């Protein structure tokens, strides 16, 4: 964890494990990569195409996301589907989600149009993950030009 520009050790609060998960996932990078592969459509026996379509259908417009630091110059539209943020990164759709618990941050996402995805796990509550993610998508977008 970073507090006042100094790295500090933090421990996961024991209360995180006293109730069933509600908006949280415990996963390794291997787990996240398998989930990403399935969501990209490469495991239809796990996530059938019709389910993927339902999960990634825009449900709620999320204008606040258009103001996200490091993202705002690229985001043209933002919605929430079922469990996924659905961004229009310039003209490239991105299916994306982030997570944050004490001491940890995570980002996962993919672009159906570009056929690429990524997952990042960091053991810090640092906002650097936003810069890493937006820079990744900027590189993907620019490589398609």
Q: What does each of the following model-derived ranges do?
A:
Residues 2-145:
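Catalytic loop of the DD-peptidase/beta-lactamase superfamily, centered on the K-T-G motif
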